[in-house]
């Protein structure tokens, strides 16, 4: 099964959207494998967003991520990276469809509530960074009702 990294950003935590977001992934049929509520320091945020370090918005993004607690999660499921991105919606909330997390809960790109891995390889890298101790090894009893 595929894994993805999902992070509820400080605005999502402050606005009380954690349960709603987890519920959307669970209702889809994905399995939660790892979960942490934490605050990160600047060095860690810079490492997470290293691929964006040359972008003009990089410093603001780092400040935003360290401004409050985040919820870091690992989800498992068939095509979870691609499907997770569809659940989240476009990076720019103005381009996100209603029914997506960003389409329903975000207005500005700089406060877009949630991060999700954009590819299987980036998911592996992000999971290794955020969950160096690994994740829970369990299988949902619902798998036969979700997967062929």
From Swiss-Prot:
It holds the Pfam family NDK. Coiled coil: none annotated. The keyword Coiled coil does not apply. ATP binds at residues 9, 57, 85, 91, 102, 112. Keywords: ATP-binding, Kinase, Magnesium, Metal-binding, Nucleotide metabolism, Nucleotide-binding, Phosphoprotein, Transferase. Gene3D superfamilies: Nucleoside diphosphate kinase-like domain. GO terms for biological process: CTP biosynthetic process; GTP biosynthetic process; UTP biosynthetic process. The keyword Nucleotidyltransferase does not apply. InterPro entries: NDK-like_dom, NDK-like_dom_sf, Nucleoside_diP_kinase, Nucleoside_diP_kinase_AS. Its cofactor is Mg(2+). It comes from the Eukaryota. Its EC number is 2.7.4.6. The active site is at residue 115. Disulfide bonds: none annotated. SMART domains: NDK. Belongs to the NDK family. HAMAP family: NDP_kinase. This is Nucleoside diphosphate kinase B. It comes from Flaveria bidentis (Coastal plain yellowtops).
